[in-house]
Amino acid sequence: MISISDTAQAHFCKLLEKQEPDTNIRVFVVNPGTPSAECGVSYCPPDAVESTDTTLEFNGFDAVVDAESAPFLSEAEIDFVTDQMGSQLTLKAPNAKARKVDDDAPLEERINYMIEAEINPQLASHGGKVMLMEITEKGEAILQFGGGCNGCSMVDVTLKDGIEKQMLAQFSGELTAVKDATEHEAGEHSYY
């Protein structure tokens, strides 16, 4: 479910030494399965463990996960990295915003998952997002851009060199093209 690097495990052990005995960590997702999902790590004293929690054993401590967060922490990775700027704990949870769908799920579900898990997080740095409007009989995914992407002069590059390439590679043989249905109006909301 969750992998924690050796450096992160050592970091947690050091932090937990200063806590009450038998305190562990809790890994959780606030608003799981939504675009506003956020992951976190906190201390988990023994009296805060619920019967429905999952307990994962690591070197020197346990990671406790609540039942609601568990499916959204599938494939999550926690690392502790040090660079010239200092040290930082990172938590990557690719399924926090959208529950991973099965490979045999309908094409529309798999495309929506890809949009929420991979594409929209990239566009969010510019205040943008994209939504799947329909899949045509010809296998074309029709998208609509919103936020900072609406009216952005780089939207064609984003679509052709980014999104379309990713989607056609991921859904080879199922999608033939990716098209934009947005009526772009440049304004203060536009990124470029």
Swiss-Prot record:
Cofactor note (record): Binds 1 [4Fe-4S] cluster per subunit. The cluster is presumably bound at the interface of two monomers.
A molecular-function term among this protein's GO annotations: 4 iron, 4 sulfur cluster binding
Extent of the signal sequence: none
Superkingdom of origin: Bacteria
Entry keyword set: 4Fe-4S, Iron, Iron-sulfur, Metal-binding
Pfam families (UniProt xref): Fe-S_biosyn, NifU
Cofactor(s) in the UniProt record: [4Fe-4S] cluster
Residues the record lists as binding [4Fe-4S] cluster: 149, 152
GO BP term (any one): protein maturation
Family assignment from sequence similarity: Belongs to the NfuA family.
Subunit structure: Homodimer.
HAMAP family: Fe_S_biogen_NfuA
The protein, known as: Fe/S biogenesis protein NfuA
Source organism per UniProt: Pseudoalteromonas atlantica (strain T6c / ATCC BAA-1087)
Lineage: Bacteria, Pseudomonadati, Pseudomonadota, Gammaproteobacteria, Alteromonadales
